[in-house]
Structure formats: structure tokens, C-alpha cells
């Protein structure tokens, strides 16, 4: 990771603290993963406070595949099985079946409908019958142990939400360039500066989480 590009956002610890503060306020955070992994940047919002405006920004500037990162416990509560029985994804991304709110949505694809689906899924005492399957929101099952167990955006979203005092759930989408290519470090840094989003790396989060368990 080009540390000179990230230094303008502070030290590793400062970047994490700013990300947590942003999450506490319900704001978005840009998370970069390892260069030898996906080498992508995701815009992440706490699911508990996601707004229609924020969802619209995810759809506009992202890949269009908006994912809801949740715990294994919530997946079981909602009876969300894996999307496939044999996951051959190189990064073992744990998609479940896609979902839609059973009530209160039209086609399910609009920003408003996707926010409604997320609100239904993470509601207290949410039940399997509250959701239709398939749908336009893609849940991701976070690995227990967070980024210390798996260095992925899924775990980063759940960890950040937990550290910020929210329900352990985050909404993520990969940021793309205007030409449709994936945004890398330089583009993510520029995107963060343009929209005033903190930028943090998975490595930053791993260091922070490690220091919390020592």
C-alpha cells in the first residue's frame, strides 16, 4: 500500500479512529483492502443509520452490487442459507441468498426500496418471513473474529459498526471509476478528498483490532 498517499489521512491509528468517529455520526468510510488481495476500495455505511441519499450514492458511484454485511447469528435468525453450497470464490466471499423486504417495497431495486429491505433485515426480532428471496440486496456473512479472522470488507464493515456502537451490520459497495474499471488506491484517495470520507485500510483495522485484544 502506498503509505505516502494515505499519510494525508493520518497515521494508521488516527485513520481508524477517524473512521470510527465517522461511523458514530452515521457517515461513510472508504476501506481499502490489501494490494495482493482484491486491491479495491469499498464505500461503507453503518446499516443501522443508512439513508436513501447514502444508498443513492452507493448505487451511483459503485458497482451496483450493494451488500449487507451481517453476523452469522443474524444469518441464522433470518434463515439465510449460503448462495451456493460449494463456494469456489478465491476470497471465499460468503454471499447468502439475496433478499427483499416482504412488504413496503415496489420492484425492490430503487434506493428507497433497498434501504427498506436493510431496515427490515436488521430490525430487532426480525423473522425469516419478513423477507422475500431472491431480491436486490445481497447479504454477506461475516466471519466470527472480524478482520483478525478474515481480512475482508465484510468483516471490516461489521467491526467498524460494532466499534462505533451500532448494530454489527454495514452496507458496502465497491467504488468504480467513470469508465467502469475498479477504483484503486489513488482513485479512492481522490474520492475520499472530494466527498470528505475518511480512508482506512484493512491492515489499519487489523492492527487496531489486535491492539484491542492484547
From Swiss-Prot:
Coiled coil: none annotated. Its cofactor is Mg(2+); Mn(2+). InterPro entries: DHBP_synth_RibB-like_a/b_dom, DHBP_synthase_RibB. Mg(2+) 2 binds at residues 38, 153. It comes from the Bacteria. It catalyses: D-ribulose 5-phosphate = (2S)-2-hydroxy-3-oxobutyl phosphate + formate + H(+). Binds 2 divalent metal cations per subunit. Magnesium or manganese. GO terms for molecular function: 3,4-dihydroxy-2-butanone-4-phosphate synthase activity; magnesium ion binding; manganese ion binding. The record marks 136, 174 as: Essential for catalytic activity. Keywords: Lyase, Magnesium, Manganese, Metal-binding, Riboflavin biosynthesis. GO terms for cellular component: cytosol. Its EC number is 4.1.99.12. Pathway: Cofactor biosynthesis; riboflavin biosynthesis; 2-hydroxy-3-oxobutyl phosphate from D-ribulose 5-phosphate: step 1/1. D-ribulose 5-phosphate binds at residues 37-38, 42, 150-154, 174. It holds the Pfam family DHBP_synthase. Mg(2+) 1 binds at residue 38. GO terms for biological process: riboflavin biosynthetic process. Belongs to the DHBP synthase family. HAMAP family: RibB. Catalyzes the conversion of D-ribulose 5-phosphate to formate and 3,4-dihydroxy-2-butanone 4-phosphate. Homodimer. This is 3,4-dihydroxy-2-butanone 4-phosphate synthase.
